[in-house]
Amino acid sequence: MPSFDVVSEVDKHALTNAVDQAQRLITNRFDFKGVDAKFERKEFDITITADADMQLDQMLDVLRTAMAKNGIDVSCLDISSMKTSGKQVKRDMTVRTGIDKELAKKIVALVKEKKLKVQASIQGDQVRVTGKKRDDLQECIATLRAAELGMPMQFNNFRD
């Protein structure tokens, strides 16, 4: 029986490259000369630090551009509010990976609502969709791509 998995993954290597490229761009920019501005990454958590909130916003734009160039969807960023400590302004971000229970339930409900001849089941941080025909699965993929669910999704493990 044909099936595929709906997942939300971010490549760690591409994320590291994006953060490193953003750091290089910031160190070379004229308006950041003499400013203590830096990006720090630990697993899927990114912290940006600068002297002013305006610079923090510019750094966020640079990071988003670098992520887009590396093929990472910027909608997976969960950005927290700014924290001020002395001269420094900080902002923490988390790169969301995996499909949480609420989103998985939305995906299953969307598949059932379209009355396609497929079944969707939640398996941890992914959703498995099975059906009798390959065409039904491809139609389901098109439906999920068209839906705005607020999280980037990939479709992998497609089996006949």
From Swiss-Prot:
Pfam families: DUF520. GO terms for molecular function: nucleotide binding. InterPro entries: DUF520 (IPR007551), UPF0234-like_C (IPR035571), UPF0234_N (IPR035570), YajQ-like_sf (IPR036183). The keyword Nucleotide-binding applies. It comes from Cellvibrio japonicus (strain Ueda107). This is Nucleotide-binding protein CJA_2652. Nucleotide-binding protein. SUPFAM superfamilies: YajQ-like (SSF89963). Keywords: Nucleotide-binding. The keyword Nucleotide-binding applies. HAMAP family: YajQ (MF_00632).
